[in-house]
Design a protein with these regions (language model features):
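Phosphate-binding site recognition
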Residues: 1-225
Length: 225
């Protein structure tokens, strides 16, 4: 990129979709993860890349991995399930968007709300976009996330009784909100320090909702339940 920039004078816009795929799928391969993080740091960190990179946009499920307590790429501005900022309406479908879809596809809005609503981001109700689109095209109310690889991967976590985790999950399934400390999570999907780390991971994956004001996690909707 540096050589092309030197020859053409043009800067690049870099887009990486699912930047965290190696963090999730190669969780046990620490060497590969470190090589990948070092690659990203070499590409984006410091003043040198700004000579030839105009903008970098990374999307993924997890926040940028931390090294000890510091972000591996601290020159990025992050928008997450815990802190979506002013991008909250773009994390999924809003109430108004779902109402419009229900009208166009002749669906009962309250039933759609019961199944796929429940995420609370920056005070806004947000719906699971994949599930809503699948409902509109397939015309069946059901759990669409059980068909994904991520769902299979988290089953061992849900079945753990790590630090009382199973009891907390059961409480949430019955409708309870449970307190969670989301700030200790290091984005490490192998070495969970406590049940709060697991719950925070599930919040990032979208399997739990999070009320930032109350600092509590909950089951967001019927699809997850």
């Amino acid at each position: 990129l540096s050589l092309i920039n030197a020859d053409s004078g043009q800067k690049f816009i870099v887009i990486i979709d699912e930047w965290d795929i190696l963090i999730r799928d190669e969780a046990h391969n620490q060497t590969l993860q470190e090589e990948y993080i070092n690659f990203l740091r070499g590409m984006f960190k410091g003043s040198e890349p700004t000579r030839f990179i105009q903008l970098a946009y990374l999307t993924g499920i997890l926040p940028i991995k931390k090294i000890k307590t510091q972000s591996a790429l601290n020159n990025f501005e992050e928008f997450t399930m815990l802190d979506p900022g002013n991008l909250a309406p773009y994390f999924g479908f809003t109430n108004e968007e779902v109402k419009s879809l229900c009208q166009n596809y002749h669906k009962n809005f309250e039933e759609v709300k019961h199944w796929y609503d429940g995420y609370l981001l920056a005070g806004q109700q947000i719906y699971n976009p994949k599930a809503v689109v699948s409902l509109m095209t397939r015309n069946i109310f059901k759990n669409y996330w059980s068909e994904t690889g991520t769902y299979t991967a988290i089953l061992p976590l849900i079945n753990m009784n790590f630090d009382g985790l199973k009891n907390v999950i059961i409480e949430m399934l019955s409708g309870a909100f449970v307190p969670v400390n989301v700030w200790s999570f290091q984005n490490d999907t192998i070495n969970f320090a406590n049940k709060d780390d697991v719950l925070t991971y599930l919040i990032h994956l979208g399997y739990l909702g999070y009320d930032a004001q109350k600092q509590m996690a909950f089951i967001p909707n019927e699809e997850i339940r």
